[in-house]
Every structure is written in C-alpha cells, then in structure tokens.
C-alpha cells in the first residue's frame, strides 16, 4: 500500500503549496481536487500540476473529478474529464455513481449508472487510466450492497471502488464492510471523527474505529493501491496534522506488511 494526500485536504492553499507539503512530509502521491485546485482543467493548468508533482517525486494517483455517471450530463462531459485526467498523468479518475441512494433508485437508474461506468472504463483503459467509484452518502454506492452490486455489475478490470468510511456505521459494521469491499476497491480515502456520526475530523490515530484493523482487511485482500488522507483535523496547523496522519498510517502499513 502507498500513502497519498488529497489536495482537497486544504482548499485555502494553492495546489502547488499542498503538493510541496505532501512531498515534504513523505507522501508518495496525491489526488488532485477537481474544483478550485484545477480551475477549468485547461492544458496549461494540468501541465503545471503534473510538472510540479513530478519534480517533487509525487505520483498523481487520482484526478478527483465530479463526473456523475447515470445522469443526463454524463455523455457530454466524460471525454473532457478523461482528457483532464490524461493531462495530469493520473492513474485513476474518481467518479460519482448516480444522484440518489441505493434503495431509493429505480432499476433503470441503476442500469444507466452501470452502462455509463462500462463505457467510461473502456474509454479510460484506452488512455491507460482506471476508474474509481466514490463511495458516498446520497449516491448508489452509499451502502455495502449498493457498492458491491455496482462494481460487480460493471465487471471491468479497470473499474473499482474508492472506499471510504461512512461515519453512520459502527466499528463492527465498518470492518465487515471493508472485508466485503476491499477486493473490489482500487483506491481508499481515510478521514474520521472521534465519535461515530461526528462532524469534526480528528487525527486518524484518534478515530472512533480502529484504522489499523481496517487496513489489515485491505492487506488480507491483496490491496496494493493508494491509501489517501482526505479531510483532516482543524485543531492543529495543516502541515503538522498531515504529518501526524502520515506517520500513523506509515506505522500501520509497515505493521500490516510484516504480519
């Protein structure tokens, strides 16, 4: 497993500064936020980010797009979003599945999302890119079952899940979900409150669930992708926070590798 930092972890700093912090701390890659840090995604902006990351020794692991499959706007938007990911030199493009939660969907809404994901995965593969599906409330991937069914229905080697903990789940439920979804995941986001269903992020070492046990589930499944810090505690200076999270995750990854 490799450790990455999502540039959305600090939306106030210029993206170049976030990249510098990531490199200084020791992260191996970054996920580039697809809004303010990228502007309109023109060739010059992407080239600048790609060059800066390369000079700092960072992979652009993911382009964090807001492309939504299964919606009317997908057909007109996906080629442009793939071009941005390509310009950045990203390994994966993050996408959003539908605009309703699993269980609230109609069969046609689910099938539309699956069809779009297959199309996207095929076109992405032509560019040497993979697709990662955001697991998030308000989307078809909000539940374990919804996320599992989506990935299984798409059934494409270059399309997986961007797993992240949803704080409505208990620690036991999170661990069970991780065991089910780790084999279907190609990216991981980590963030946490100190208490279940909390709003304020804390250091990952203070998470209400055992982050190390979660990573063990992924290690057992043979996961070898990025584990990315997404949102961080606001109680300390930014660089100190992402450094602490990196040190903690590094210790857990090394332990998992040796167990």
Where are these regions (language model features)?
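Conserved active-site loop/cleft motifs that coordinate metal ions or position small ligands
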Residues: 187, 224-232
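Active-site groove signature of glycoside hydrolases
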Residues: 85-105, 127-137, 228
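Conserved beta-strand positions
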Residues: 5, 32, 63, 95, ...
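N-terminal pre-domain/capping segments
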Residues: 1-86, 90, 156, 160, ...
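Acidic/histidine-rich catalytic cores of soluble enzymes
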Residues: 16, 29, 119-208
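Alpha-helical scaffolding segments of alpha/beta enzyme cores, especially the outer helices
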Residues: 17-21, 44-51, 55, 76-87, ...
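A structural motif
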Residues: 27, 90, 185, 223-224
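Acidic-and-aromatic substrate-binding clefts and catalytic sites of carbohydrate-active enzymes
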Residues: 8-15, 32-45, 67-76, 100-105, ...
């Amino acid at each position: 497993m490799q450790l990455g930092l999502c540039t959305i972890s600090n939306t106030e700093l210029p993206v170049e500064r976030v990249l510098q912090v990531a490199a200084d701390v020791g992260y191996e890659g970054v996920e580039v936020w697809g809004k303010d840090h990228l502007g309109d995604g023109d060739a010059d902006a992407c080239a600048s980010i790609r060059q800066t990351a390369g000079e700092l020794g960072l992979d652009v692991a993911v382009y964090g797009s807001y492309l939504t499959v299964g919606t009317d706007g997908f057909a007109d938007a996906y080629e442009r979003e793939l071009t941005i990911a390509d310009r950045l030199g990203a390994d994966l493009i993050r996408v959003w599945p539908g605009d309703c939660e699993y269980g609230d969907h109609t069969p046609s809404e689910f099938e539309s999302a699956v069809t779009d994901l297959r199309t996207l995965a095929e076109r992405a593969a032509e560019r040497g890119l993979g697709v990662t599906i955001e697991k998030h409330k308000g989307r078809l991937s909000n539940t374990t079952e919804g996320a599992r069914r989506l990935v299984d229905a798409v059934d494409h080697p270059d399309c997986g899940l961007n797993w992240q903990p949803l704080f409505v789940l208990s620690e036991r439920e999170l661990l069970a979900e991780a065991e089910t979804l780790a084999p279907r995941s190609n990216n991981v986001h980590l963030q946490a409150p100190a208490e279940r269903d909390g709003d304020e992020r804390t250091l990952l070492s203070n998470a209400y669930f055992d982050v190390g046990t979660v990573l063990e589930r992924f290690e057992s499944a043979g996961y070898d992708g990025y584990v990315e810090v997404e949102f961080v505690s606001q109680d300390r200076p930014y660089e100190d926070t992402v450094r602490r999270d990196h040190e903690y995750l590094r210790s857990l990854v090394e332990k998992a590798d040796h167990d």
